[in-house]
Amino acid sequence: MTTRREGRELALQALYSKDLVLQDANTTLKRITESFSEGEEPTLSVNSKAYAFASELVNGVVSNLQAIDSRIAEKSKHWSMARMARVDLNILRLAVFELLYRPDIPKNVTMNEAIEVAKKFGADDSASFVNGILDEIASTVTDKE
């Protein structure tokens, strides 16, 4: 797994957990990574670059949540955000943050990564759902945005 994929997955877990327990996303991210080093099982290490990328994504989503959610709501025809699965919504939030605020990451990379994360963490139809909405949003994003 690439460092950025690991970061995206950590960020998704933090945002999802934040939605469930209504806790600060950075605190949640820290707890998730700490849980990798606790317990009696062999520890999993979290790459420091992956953690830094996850933290950047989480902070970016939280700081720009209103603009991100507005884009998602605008393009999610027939789906209110309240009806969306929390996993799918947070995958969309992460990807929309990248599309809008990280011009250094190519659009196709952002979309492919979101689809792969949706396949891993979402329901059977999550990948196609995420792809459909992201395709609509990506088509409206200019390179300078």
From Swiss-Prot:
GO biological process: DNA-templated transcription termination; transcription antitermination
GO MF term (any one): RNA binding
KW Zinc-finger (keyword) present: no
GO CC annotations, alphabetized: cytosol
Coiled-coil spans in chain: none
CDD domains attached to this UniProt entry: Terminator_NusB
Pfam families reported for this sequence: NusB
Keyword Transcription regulation recorded: yes
Domain of life: Bacteria
InterPro entries attached to this UniProt entry: NusB-like_sf, NusB_fam, NusB_RsmB_TIM44
Key words of the record: RNA-binding, Transcription, Transcription antitermination, Transcription regulation
Functional description taken from the UniProt entry: Involved in transcription antitermination. Required for transcription of ribosomal RNA (rRNA) genes. Binds specifically to the boxA antiterminator sequence of the ribosomal RNA (rrn) operons.
NCBIfam families in alphabetical order: nusB
PANTHER family: ANTITERMINATION NUSB DOMAIN-CONTAINING PROTEIN, N UTILIZATION SUBSTANCE PROTEIN B-RELATED
Family stated for the protein in its record: Belongs to the NusB family.
Record protein name field: Transcription antitermination protein NusB
Species of provenance: Citrifermentans bemidjiense (strain ATCC BAA-1014 / DSM 16622 / JCM 12645 / Bem) (Geobacter bemidjiensis)
Gene: nusB
